[in-house]
Amino acid sequence: MNRDELADVRNEMLGFIFQQYNLLPKLNLVENVEVPLMYAGVPRAERRERARIALERVGLGDKLKHKPSQLSGGQQQRASIARALAGEPAVILADEPTGALDSRTGREVLELLQALHAAGHTVVLITHDNSIAVQAQRIIRLEDGWVVYDGLANAPEAVVTPRAAGGKGGGAP
Protein backbone atom coordinates (compact mmCIF):
# COMPACT_ATOMS: atom_id res chain seq x y z
CA MET A 1 0.00 0.00 0.00
CA ASN A 2 1.15 3.51 -0.68
CA ARG A 3 0.96 6.32 1.89
CA ASP A 4 -2.46 7.55 0.77
CA GLU A 5 -3.93 4.04 0.93
CA LEU A 6 -2.49 3.55 4.42
CA ALA A 7 -3.95 6.90 5.50
CA ASP A 8 -7.35 5.77 4.20
CA VAL A 9 -7.14 2.53 6.20
CA ARG A 10 -6.21 4.44 9.36
CA ASN A 11 -9.01 6.93 8.81
CA GLU A 12 -11.73 4.39 7.94
CA MET A 13 -10.87 1.33 10.03
CA LEU A 14 -9.11 2.63 13.16
CA GLY A 15 -10.19 4.84 16.03
CA PHE A 16 -7.44 6.25 18.25
CA ILE A 17 -7.80 7.08 21.95
CA PHE A 18 -4.74 8.96 23.10
CA GLN A 19 -3.34 8.99 26.62
CA GLN A 20 -3.25 12.80 26.69
CA TYR A 21 -6.60 13.29 24.88
CA ASN A 22 -5.19 15.57 22.14
CA LEU A 23 -8.29 17.76 22.06
CA LEU A 24 -7.91 21.09 20.28
CA PRO A 25 -8.35 23.83 22.93
CA LYS A 26 -10.06 26.42 20.70
CA LEU A 27 -12.72 24.00 19.45
CA ASN A 28 -15.80 22.87 21.34
CA LEU A 29 -16.49 19.15 21.81
CA VAL A 30 -18.63 18.75 18.69
CA GLU A 31 -15.94 20.43 16.59
CA ASN A 32 -13.19 18.30 18.18
CA VAL A 33 -15.07 15.09 17.40
CA GLU A 34 -15.71 16.30 13.84
CA VAL A 35 -12.02 16.76 12.97
CA PRO A 36 -11.25 13.20 11.76
CA LEU A 37 -14.59 13.09 9.93
CA MET A 38 -13.65 16.28 8.09
CA TYR A 39 -10.44 14.61 6.88
CA ALA A 40 -12.52 11.60 5.82
CA GLY A 41 -14.62 13.85 3.59
CA VAL A 42 -17.86 13.40 5.55
CA PRO A 43 -20.34 16.21 4.70
CA ARG A 44 -20.77 18.88 7.39
CA ALA A 45 -24.35 18.04 8.45
CA GLU A 46 -23.51 14.35 8.77
CA ARG A 47 -20.32 15.18 10.70
CA ARG A 48 -22.30 17.25 13.20
CA GLU A 49 -24.87 14.51 13.70
CA ARG A 50 -22.28 11.76 14.09
CA ALA A 51 -20.30 13.89 16.55
CA ARG A 52 -23.43 14.61 18.58
CA ILE A 53 -24.40 10.93 18.68
CA ALA A 54 -20.87 9.87 19.68
CA LEU A 55 -20.76 12.45 22.49
CA GLU A 56 -24.17 11.35 23.76
CA ARG A 57 -22.98 7.74 23.67
CA VAL A 58 -20.16 8.57 26.09
CA GLY A 59 -22.39 10.62 28.39
CA LEU A 60 -21.43 14.10 27.18
CA GLY A 61 -24.63 15.07 25.39
CA ASP A 62 -25.05 18.03 27.74
CA LYS A 63 -21.53 19.37 27.03
CA LEU A 64 -21.57 19.66 23.23
CA LYS A 65 -20.56 23.33 23.14
CA HIS A 66 -18.01 23.14 25.97
CA LYS A 67 -14.32 23.70 25.30
CA PRO A 68 -11.85 21.10 26.65
CA SER A 69 -10.68 23.50 29.38
CA GLN A 70 -14.21 23.48 30.81
CA LEU A 71 -14.14 19.71 31.38
CA SER A 72 -12.65 17.34 33.94
CA GLY A 73 -9.94 14.88 32.89
CA GLY A 74 -12.49 12.07 32.72
CA GLN A 75 -14.80 14.14 30.54
CA GLN A 76 -11.91 15.02 28.25
CA GLN A 77 -11.02 11.33 27.94
CA ARG A 78 -14.65 10.49 27.12
CA ALA A 79 -14.57 13.21 24.45
CA SER A 80 -11.44 11.55 23.07
CA ILE A 81 -13.32 8.24 23.00
CA ALA A 82 -16.24 9.91 21.20
CA ARG A 83 -13.80 11.25 18.60
CA ALA A 84 -12.49 7.71 18.09
CA LEU A 85 -16.04 6.33 17.73
CA ALA A 86 -17.48 8.95 15.39
CA GLY A 87 -15.80 7.38 12.38
CA GLU A 88 -17.44 4.03 13.23
CA PRO A 89 -14.14 2.12 13.24
CA ALA A 90 -13.88 -1.65 13.46
CA VAL A 91 -10.77 -1.36 15.66
CA ILE A 92 -10.16 1.01 18.56
CA LEU A 93 -6.55 1.57 19.67
CA ALA A 94 -6.43 2.91 23.23
CA ASP A 95 -3.04 4.11 24.51
CA GLU A 96 -3.08 4.13 28.33
CA PRO A 97 -6.65 5.51 28.34
CA THR A 98 -6.84 5.56 32.15
CA GLY A 99 -3.29 6.71 32.89
CA ALA A 100 -4.17 10.32 33.73
CA LEU A 101 -7.46 9.56 35.50
CA ASP A 102 -8.48 8.91 39.09
CA SER A 103 -9.52 5.33 39.87
CA ARG A 104 -13.30 5.96 39.71
CA THR A 105 -13.11 7.73 36.35
CA GLY A 106 -10.67 5.10 35.10
CA ARG A 107 -13.20 2.38 35.94
CA GLU A 108 -15.87 4.30 34.02
CA VAL A 109 -13.62 4.53 30.95
CA LEU A 110 -12.83 0.80 31.17
CA GLU A 111 -16.54 -0.01 31.44
CA LEU A 112 -17.16 2.06 28.32
CA LEU A 113 -14.39 0.22 26.44
CA GLN A 114 -15.83 -3.13 27.58
CA ALA A 115 -19.27 -2.05 26.30
CA LEU A 116 -17.73 -1.11 22.95
CA HIS A 117 -16.11 -4.54 22.77
CA ALA A 118 -19.44 -6.19 23.60
CA ALA A 119 -21.01 -4.15 20.77
CA GLY A 120 -18.59 -5.70 18.27
CA HIS A 121 -15.58 -3.39 18.24
CA THR A 122 -12.08 -4.80 18.54
CA VAL A 123 -10.37 -2.90 21.36
CA VAL A 124 -6.58 -2.93 21.60
CA LEU A 125 -5.63 -1.40 24.94
CA ILE A 126 -2.04 -0.53 25.77
CA THR A 127 -1.29 -0.41 29.48
CA HIS A 128 1.45 -0.89 32.04
CA ASP A 129 -1.13 -1.61 34.76
CA ASN A 130 -1.66 -5.34 35.33
CA SER A 131 -4.93 -4.69 37.18
CA ILE A 132 -6.26 -3.24 33.93
CA ALA A 133 -4.66 -5.85 31.66
CA VAL A 134 -6.26 -8.78 33.48
CA GLN A 135 -9.70 -7.40 32.62
CA ALA A 136 -9.07 -8.18 28.96
CA GLN A 137 -9.89 -11.45 27.24
CA ARG A 138 -6.41 -11.74 25.77
CA ILE A 139 -3.08 -10.35 26.91
CA ILE A 140 -0.02 -9.91 24.75
CA ARG A 141 2.88 -8.82 26.95
CA LEU A 142 6.01 -7.27 25.45
CA GLU A 143 9.42 -6.90 27.05
CA ASP A 144 12.26 -5.18 25.23
CA GLY A 145 10.42 -5.56 21.93
CA TRP A 146 9.75 -9.29 22.38
CA VAL A 147 6.45 -11.07 22.89
CA VAL A 148 6.91 -12.85 26.22
CA TYR A 149 3.30 -13.78 26.87
CA ASP A 150 0.33 -14.34 24.59
CA GLY A 151 -2.74 -15.92 26.07
CA LEU A 152 -6.03 -15.55 27.83
CA ALA A 153 -6.01 -13.23 30.80
CA ASN A 154 -7.45 -15.94 33.04
CA ALA A 155 -5.22 -18.77 31.78
CA PRO A 156 -1.86 -18.88 33.61
CA GLU A 157 -0.77 -21.79 31.41
CA ALA A 158 -0.84 -19.56 28.31
CA VAL A 159 2.20 -19.72 26.06
CA VAL A 160 5.28 -17.90 27.35
CA THR A 161 8.25 -17.70 25.00
CA PRO A 162 11.63 -19.19 25.95
CA ARG A 163 13.02 -15.64 26.19
CA ALA A 164 10.64 -14.91 29.09
CA ALA A 165 11.81 -18.08 30.79
CA GLY A 166 15.43 -16.96 30.58
CA GLY A 167 16.29 -18.43 27.18
CA LYS A 168 17.37 -16.58 24.08
CA GLY A 169 14.93 -15.58 21.38
CA GLY A 170 11.79 -17.54 20.71
CA GLY A 171 9.44 -14.58 20.57
CA ALA A 172 8.57 -12.23 17.81
CA PRO A 173 10.07 -8.75 18.05
Language-model segments: residues:
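ABC family nucleotide-binding domain
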Residues: 1-142
